[in-house]
Structures are given as C-alpha cells and as structure tokens.
C-alpha cells in the first residue's frame, strides 16, 4: 500500500513538472521565432518535455499493474475499481513511547530465531561441541539484535527530522505560492514564473508526504523488530 501511494506521489509530481515543461517549451518556441534563442534551445526544451512524458507513461503503466495486483490479493476482480484510502500519518504517541533500552530487551526476548535456538539448546549436551557452537551463535545473534535496534531507533529519529525539514520547506513555499497567487490576480507575474512557483509548491507538498511515509516505514520496522520479526544473518 505504501508503494502504491508513493507511486501516486511521483505521478502527481510529474504532472506538475509536465505542466511547467510544456509552458517552457512553448515559450522557447516563441523566443526562437523572434530570434531570441537557437533551435538547439528548442530541441533541448522538447527533449526535457519528452523525457518527463515518457516517465509519466511508465508510472501510469506501473500504477495499473500495482492496482490490479492489490485487487487480486484482496479478492476483487483484477479490473475492479475499489477506493484505496490514503495511508494515515504516524501517531506521534508511538514515537514518544519508544525506549531503546527496554525495547531492545523485548526484541531479544521476542525474536523468533533466538527463541528457536534457545529451545534447541535444551536438547544438547552441556559442554558438547554442538552446545558450544550454538552458544556462540546465540551470542552473535543477540549482538546483532542490539545493533539493529540502535540502527532502527536512529532511523526513526532521522526520518522524523526529515519530516520536520520538509514541513518547514513547505511552509516557505506556501508563503511564496500565496504571493504568486496575489501577483497573478493583479497581472504582476508571467505565466511561466507562476508555473515555476506552482511546481515548487507541488514538489514541497510531495516531499512532506514522502517524508510522512518514510517515517511510517521507519516506525513500522522498529515495531516489527520489537515484536520479534527481525531477520538475523546468523
């Protein structure tokens, strides 16, 4: 579901970019007709537009494919059109409740691989080679869980900081967008300049939602590890 929404975000971002590049291409053509730019400039603008259009076609094809897969997995006909709701934001309380020390202890207790190996230990003879090997394996796995929990914890912290930065950037672009809207109403801004600001604002919106999804993924990965669902290399 997260992957599907991320794809829709890319689609929305490209749609805004397409609108801007279409305007840039048309403006470049007019400038070329007036002798203000060369045909190479026109070609470059057209290539940029074509590249983004190709990217949009790829995203739309992937959107159909993912949607059909989701429908099939959920028991609908592959060509059904169910409403797929937006994924909710992370509850800040989930992050506030995180405690690396106690959560790491829970992860050690709950890890399925460690549980299996601890049970296997009960079937071995004390002092045997097999017992010694298993004890070393368990020790290495416990160290891996501890290290992974540290990494997952700081991944959440980093994702939260990235969201804060994205929200700050969006606030700035919102102010610029509001100003551009007022200027447009008064005829004080050209269409190309307005579309550039509109695209910058749309990009900032996408960045915030992308950061929200990134934070959700980081929190989910942390919670899964606490519940014992951490794959170990040993």
Task: Describe the predicted segments one by one.
Residues 6-58, 161-209, 223-224, 230:
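Charged, solvent-exposed structural "stalk/scaffold" segments
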Residues 11, 18, 25, 32, ...:
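Leucine-rich amphipathic alpha-helices with coiled-coil/heptad-repeat character
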């Amino acid at each position: 579901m997260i992957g599907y929404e991320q794809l829709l975000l890319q689609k929305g971002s490209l749609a805004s970019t397409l609108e801007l590049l279409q305007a840039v291409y048309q403006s470049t053509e007019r400038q070329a007709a007036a002798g203000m730019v060369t045909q190479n400039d026109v070609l470059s603008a057209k290539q940029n537009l074509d590249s983004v259009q190709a990217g949009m076609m790829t995203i739309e094809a992937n959107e159909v494919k993912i949607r059909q897969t989701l429908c099939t997995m959920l028991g609908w006909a592959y060509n059904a059109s169910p409403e797929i709701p937006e994924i909710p934001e992370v509850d800040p309380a989930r992050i506030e409740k995180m405690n690396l020390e106690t959560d790491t202890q829970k992860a050690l207790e709950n890890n399925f691989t460690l549980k299996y190996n601890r049970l296997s230990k009960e079937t071995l003879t004390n002092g045997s080679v097999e017992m010694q090997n298993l004890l070393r394996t368990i020790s290495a796995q416990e160290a891996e869980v501890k290290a992974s929990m540290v990494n997952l914890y700081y991944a959440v912290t980093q994702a939260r900081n990235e969201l804060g930065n994205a929200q700050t950037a969006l606030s700035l672009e919102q102010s610029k967008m509001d100003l551009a809207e007022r200027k447009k109403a008064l005829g004080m801004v050209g269409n190309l300049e307005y579309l550039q600001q509109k695209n910058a604002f749309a990009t900032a919106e996408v960045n915030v939602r992308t950061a929200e999804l990134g934070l959700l993924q980081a929190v989910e990965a942390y919670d899964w590890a606490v519940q014992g669902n951490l794959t170990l290399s040993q």
